Amino acid sequence: MKRALPAIETAMTAALVAWIGGMFALGAFSARILFRDLPRETAAPAMSTIFRSFDGVVVACVVVVALATGLRLMAVGLRHRPDRIALVAGTALTILGCLDVGYVHPAIARMQAEGGTLEPAFQALHTLSSRSFNLEAICAILIVGAYAWSRRET
C-alpha cells in the first residue's frame, strides 16, 4: 500500500486545487465582478446558480479527499506528526464539504428563491459559508504542508 502513496497524495492535491482554487476564483472574482456590474437582484441569483453548479465539483472532491485520507492512513499509519495532521485536516475538510453541499448552499439557495436575502438568517448563512471556506483553505494548507513535512522524515 505504501507504494501507492504518491498516487494517493497526487489525487488529494488535485482535488484540493480544484475545490479550494475553484471556490477562491468564484468568490474573489466572479462574485465581485457580478455584484459590481449587475443589479443586486440579478447578481445574487446568478451567483447562487454558479455556486450550485460548482457543488458537483465539491462533491467529487469531497469523495476524493475522503478516500485519499483513508487510503493514506492505511498506507502510513499515524506514527509521525505529519500523518496525524493530514488525517485530522482531511477529515475536517470532508466534514466541511458535506456541511456546505448538504446544508449551507441549499439553505442559501432556498432563502434566495424565497426572497429572504435581506433577512438576518441569510446573513448568518452567508457568514457561515465564508467561514467554512476559510477553514477549508486552512485544512488544504495543512494537508499539503503535512505531505511536504512527511517527506523530510522519511
Question: What is each stretch, according to the model?
Answer:
Residues C139-S150:
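Membrane-water interface at the C-terminal end of transmembrane alpha helices
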Residues P106-G116, S132-L135:
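Phosphate-binding/catalytic loops
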Residues T91-P106:
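Mid-bilayer segments of alpha-helical transmembrane spans in multi-pass integral membrane proteins
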Residues K2-V76, M111-Q123:
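Interfacial loop at the N-terminal end of multi-pass membrane proteins
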Residues D55-V62, H126-I141:
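Hydrophobic alpha-helical transmembrane segments
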Residues K2-R3, W149-T154:
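Short, charged juxtamembrane terminal tails flanking transmembrane helices
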Residues L73-T91, R152-T154:
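Cytoplasmic juxtamembrane regions at transmembrane-helix boundaries
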